[in-house]
Design a protein with these regions (language model features):
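Regulatory nucleotide-sensing modules
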Residues: 1-39
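Short beta-strand segments in beta-sandwich/barrel cores
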Residues: 40-46, 64
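Conserved small/polar residues in nucleotide/adenosyl-binding loops
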Residues: 159-166
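Short histidine-centered beta-strand/loop micro-motifs
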Residues: 23-29, 47, 67-69, 109-112
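Cyclic-nucleotide recognition modules
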Residues: 49-107
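Polybasic "coupling" helices that flank or enter modular domains
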Residues: 97-155
Length: 166
């Protein structure tokens, strides 16, 4: 994984290729500004060692990441597809919608469903409805999700093959 640190004191467009991550340091950013996704899909996650890269949100074109509300260690933004975002955009005060908070609440709700099958169905439902598309009896997401990431998102381990028996 390519990883860059980004404080970003000047307003500019930042471009990341699929798989790159950037650490957003809130202490080096002007107050009252945010990042705004121009194109692509990003995963926002916590860089703290204790939370092991916990996913907070997925962002797409037009979504804003308020950097003044982040924890002191900041957050990481990972490009799930080729990504570009504007730095130091003024926060849309009257929008009434915070994409990161909305995603975090939905992911928390999914993790509290009764069993792994329910959590998996709920996860794919929200991902397809917001970021993907249905294609008959299957669905398509514009990025790859590993078994490890799916397990992290639904709060359980996923096994792709049965364990050997003696």
């Amino acid at each position: 994984m390519n990883f860059h640190s980004y404080g970003g004191s000047s307003s500019k467009t930042v471009r990341l290729v699929t798989g790159q991550s950037v650490l957003i340091d809130p202490s080096s950013r002007p107050r009252g500004t945010c990042l705004e996704v121009e194109s692509g899909i990003a995963r926002v996650y916590c860089p703290c060692e204790e939370t092991e890269g916990m996913t907070l949100a997925f962002l797409q074109s037009g979504d804003q990441l308020r950097t003044d509300l982040l924890c002191s260690e900041g957050v990481c933004v990972e490009a799930l597809t080729d990504l570009s975002f504007h730095s130091n955009v003024n926060i849309a005060e009257n929008s009434g919608f915070d994409a990161v908070n909305e995603w975090t609440l939905q992911l928390l709700r999914i993790r509290h469903l009764g069993n792994a099958e329910q959590r998996l169905q709920a996860l794919f439902s929200i991902l397809v409805n917001r970021l993907g598309r249905r294609c008959g009896q299957w669905c398509e997401l514009p990025f790859r999700l590993t078994h490890e990431r799916i397990g992290e998102l639904i709060g359980c381990l996923l096994y792709t093959s049965p364990s050997p028996r003696d």
